[in-house]
């Protein structure tokens, strides 16, 4: 066990930093190069996007989970420094992951693509880093590209973000250029962690993973004090205590250690059995010498998008619950509660941070846990003011009160920042207008790029805004949004009736202006998807009692006259009447099977079809 002096000297050598960048600006590649350069990973084990350990991350080329890795770097001054690289996601839905990892750092490397310049999400993450008082080191990456223009990007960093970019490193993570300069700048510019080894333990939980053998493993950043195997730790939010069975660091693989001291980033295993006992953002302290107060954690992220998740096989309901609990463990922002639907049976109403988050969760459930799912149309949280003066928060269309009880409805608006090349400004404005957006401001970043700011209803964004934005700007636009306010809107709930019965899972909320078109579109779409029955099935779209659109699926009929060659007309009529009576009886008791595509079709309604 080293003495206090040695620990303090070691603390001087620690550098905690993360890498922030927009998607595809080369963040994971840079992390790979840093791992190679510091010889943390042997060239035999090296693979591209090493830190993106989920298959899903590799395939989509995005970082979803954060990772924390310890590296040793021998600097030019002859000293060996301990680096903790905390890898962060770049996508707007994972901002909370970014804020968690930045809370564990003192510095951040800002990677900007030399050809593309600053993008909307780069800005969003930089502001998070500035809020956390981090030292920011700009790096202009991909300088070996033919289209690279490092000087333009340098002035952009200075003008748009206001950082001094005169010492920005020009690098190419792919070709391995400039990596050493980056490492030297980390040593010089990123401050060593503040904190006192002798103070009572305070460690911030920034992530947790579930291990079937060792229980919940916490990833922590030690802010004050130290923790070692055999200590009794206590969670400050709920006072529960556990015995530490193992502490250690990640070099991507977990490596056991005797202790973690101030400034260290590593893991603590304490045979914690239940997921609920450890909340990300909580403070760990020692039971026999607790800290006076917890560290300020993160702001609790509230889900913005809700959808119902139902297992296709109803006996998988419990498996789905267990899977969601496991995902919730290291994704504190996922919320879920049980719900039932007449059409789909038992399932869960889940809350997500955004569409990508929803997609990723759905895909992880299907892949990692082998559960086939039906997902209902995503909706947002509405504020419904009733006639008797109550305010209800409703996230599920089927929970909307009767139209006669509703006084006003408010829906969430977001402030959307869209960065786009000048020639696509028209297309972006047209799209935003069509999505009921209100124009706020527009500013030119340089001769060619424009930052357009709109207030847009979140309900329109969760629908298909991102895909539409990408296709109308040929993929050049980048987009970031944050919740701004609730506004009163003319909204109505639309029900879909099949054979006179409401299908609760197909209900959705729509603006009164688009109600007729949307209703017409859906009934036509369902007509194509729902197979023909033995009897005629009317499909109707209704607002309250009023039917706004209708179409019929024609019945399949057998030719009952085939066996009458000639014969009297009354004989034929008798057979037809008999068939008609049979169909009528069938229709009265018949129920219509709704295929899964029908639910999905409500999701994927194209504007162009409107």
Curated annotation (Swiss-Prot):
InterPro entries: EF-4, EFG_III/V, EFG_V-like, EFTu-like_2, G_TR_CS, LepA_C_sf, LepA_CTD, LepA_IV. GO terms for cellular component: plasma membrane. Keywords: Cell membrane, GTP-binding, Hydrolase, Membrane, Nucleotide-binding, Protein biosynthesis. Residues 12-194 form the tr-type G domain. It is an enzyme of class 3 (hydrolase). GO terms for molecular function: GTP binding; GTPase activity; ribosome binding; translation elongation factor activity. Required for accurate and efficient protein synthesis under certain stress conditions. May act as a fidelity factor of the translation reaction, by catalyzing a one-codon backward translocation of tRNAs on improperly translocated ribosomes. Back-translocation proceeds from a post-translocation (POST) complex to a pre-translocation (PRE) complex, thus giving elongation factor G a second chance to translocate the tRNAs correctly. Binds to ribosomes in a GTP-dependent manner. This is Elongation factor 4. The lineage of its organism: Bacteria, Bacillati, Bacillota, Bacilli, Lactobacillales. The gene is lepA.
